[in-house]
From Swiss-Prot:
<feature type="active site">
    <location>
        <position position="113"/>
    </location>
</feature>
<dbReference type="GO" id="GO:0008824">
    <property type="term" value="F:cyanate hydratase activity"/>
</dbReference>
<feature type="active site">
    <location>
        <position position="87"/>
    </location>
</feature>
<dbReference type="GO" id="GO:0003677">
    <property type="term" value="F:DNA binding"/>
</dbReference>
<dbReference type="InterPro" id="IPR036581">
    <property type="entry name" value="Cyanate_lyase_C_sf"/>
</dbReference>
<protein>
    <recommendedName>
        <fullName>Cyanate hydratase</fullName>
        <ecNumber>4.2.1.104</ecNumber>
    </recommendedName>
</protein>
<comment type="similarity">
    <text>Belongs to the cyanase family.</text>
</comment>
<dbReference type="GO" id="GO:0009439">
    <property type="term" value="P:cyanate metabolic process"/>
</dbReference>
<feature type="active site">
    <location>
        <position position="90"/>
    </location>
</feature>
<dbReference type="InterPro" id="IPR003712">
    <property type="entry name" value="Cyanate_lyase_C"/>
</dbReference>
<dbReference type="Pfam" id="PF02560">
    <property type="entry name" value="Cyanate_lyase"/>
</dbReference>
<dbReference type="InterPro" id="IPR010982">
    <property type="entry name" value="Lambda_DNA-bd_dom_sf"/>
</dbReference>
<comment type="function">
    <text>Catalyzes the reaction of cyanate with bicarbonate to produce ammonia and carbon dioxide.</text>
</comment>
<keyword id="KW-0456">Lyase</keyword>
<dbReference type="InterPro" id="IPR008076">
    <property type="entry name" value="Cyanase"/>
</dbReference>
């Protein structure tokens, strides 16, 4: 998978400015995961958000237009090769159908929205090794009968 040029530019500017995604969350008022998705062109910013980001990163204002364009979503191969991303694929391979069954028992026949959706990543201290806590919250959408 090749990283888009604009993504490389944004990541380098973030590094050059000594900023984290959490720092940018405070500046933009958006979740750090959403901001990372914006960097990878999996989300689009409002003009105001793009201006704030470009200013924080010290980039030329011409980047505002790129950040406000609607992106083509979905990045990378169907089976991911990055080890961290592959773990999520593996989790879905193992637990996808069990999660689906539990959701359907609780909500009925439908899906969890990835549009009306939030995702948070937290670090949990553990004496056996720090843990990654990921919380996904998506609106339940029942299938329509007609």
């Amino acid at each position: 998978m090749s990283i888009p040029e604009i993504t490389q530019t944004l990541l380098q500017a973030k590094k050059d400015q000594g900023l984290s995604f959490a720092d940018l969350e405070a500046i933009l008022g958006r979740n750090e995961v959403w901001i990372a998705a914006l960097f990878y062109r999996q989300a689009s910013a409002s003009e105001e958000e793009a201006k704030l980001l470009v200013e924080a990163l010290g980039l030329d204002p011409s980047y505002i237009q790129h950040l406000t364009e609607y992106p083509i979503k979905g990045l990378g191969p169907i089976v991911p090769t990055d080890p961290l991303i592959y773990r999520f694929y593996e989790i879905m391979q193992v637990y996808g159908f069990p999660i689906k069954q539990v959701i359907q028992e609780k909500f009925g026949d439908g899906i969890m929205s990835a549009i009306d959706f939030t995702l948070d990543v937290e670090k949990e201290a553990d004496p056996k090794g720090d843990r990654v806590k990921i919380t996904m919250s998506g609106k339940f959408l029942p299938y329509k009968k007609w």
